[in-house]
Curated annotation (Swiss-Prot):
Region Important for fusion, annotated ranges: 149-180
TM segment ranges: 53-73, 243-263
Region entry Interaction with APOA2, spans: 6-57
GO BP, one annotated term: fusion of virus membrane with host endosome membrane
Stated name of the protein: Genome polyprotein
Residues carrying sugar: 80, 93, 118, 189, 301, 307, 314
Sorted UniProt keywords: Apoptosis, Capsid protein, Clathrin-mediated endocytosis of virus by host, Fusion of virus membrane with host endosomal membrane, Fusion of virus membrane with host membrane, Glycoprotein, Host cytoplasm, Host endoplasmic reticulum, Host lipid droplet, Host membrane, Host mitochondrion, Host nucleus, Host-virus interaction, Inhibition of host innate immune response by virus, Interferon antiviral system evasion, Membrane, Oncogene, Ribonucleoprotein, RNA-binding, Transmembrane, Transmembrane helix, Ubl conjugation, Viral attachment to host cell, Viral envelope protein, Viral immunoevasion, Viral nucleoprotein, Viral penetration into host cytoplasm, Virion, Virus endocytosis by host, Virus entry into host cell
Species this chain originates from: Hepatitis C virus (isolate HCT18) (HCV)
Similarity comment: Belongs to the hepacivirus polyprotein family.
InterPro entries: HCV_Core_C (IPR002521), HCV_Env (IPR002519), HCV_NS1 (IPR002531)
Leader sequence residues: none
Region Important for lipid droplets localization, residue ranges: 48-51
Amino acid sequence: RNLGKVIDTLTCGFADLMGYIPLVGAPLGGAARALAHGVRVLEDGVNYATGNLPGCSFSIFLLALLSCLTVPASAHQVRNSTGLYHVTNDCPNSSIVYEAADAILHTPGCVPCVHEGNVSRCWVAVTPTVATRDGKLPTTQLRRHIDLLVGSATLCSALYVGDLCGSVFLVGQLFTFSPRRHWTTQGCNCSIYPGHITGHRMAWDMMMNWSPTAALVMAQLLRIPQAIMDMIAGAHWGVLAGIAYFSMVGNWAKVLVVLLLFAGVDAETYTSGGNAGHTMTGIVRFFAPGPKQNVHLINTNGSWHINSTALNCNDSLNTGW
């Protein structure tokens, strides 16, 4: 609704300016006012749809949280070497958003290359936007930030300034407040896919590329029961206060968002959906045909016999010989 006021001010002001144009001001002003009324009708429809559905009163704050789930598919990085630009997977300094002791938050489409000592090595990509030193996610630091985020959101909602806080959060994404902790370079040419690439891994990544938001939400839904136990045992008071407040006011959509946000930081995080990929691999292997050997019939002087040693390269791979 607050955004609608800004849009109405712009459209109505534009219509008034069109009306002051000599000779053609009357028809242009009328058309511009009709357009402004049409925009107002669309805004009323959006306000009704998002404000009257049970548990779905989306505000700018909720849209700010949902904006964190999108992953641009066209992200790419280049490295400037003596005037020549080379496409690389290494993150430039402009792609680094936040740095912790053992984790780096960056924009999608690259992997940080950190210079430590006298060597540069690639960090392990845990998610499209988070890389760690050894592939293990430091859940303590991230969950501390989630506590602060949810606690701030709860306070903003209790004070009825959720739209203002949401606007501040959106503007805050344009700036970096933390100091640099690591020396990132572009001399590694890191791989987006660490480890052994299998067909199941490629199929899983293809599914995530089709709908990264849906894949992320489904993976987090399966972690909610364990996340509830973790937030109680770990005394995450910000998250608990947020869930309690939003439950009391009947805002179940925000309760679900808080649970998904906390469940996204799991103590047993695997690289690029490796947990679900490993489970799916075990199911698919049950239907695998297994090794086989083709039987070859050889005609020698008019008589047929079986030659079991006539193996080609593919047979050798299937049988293990």
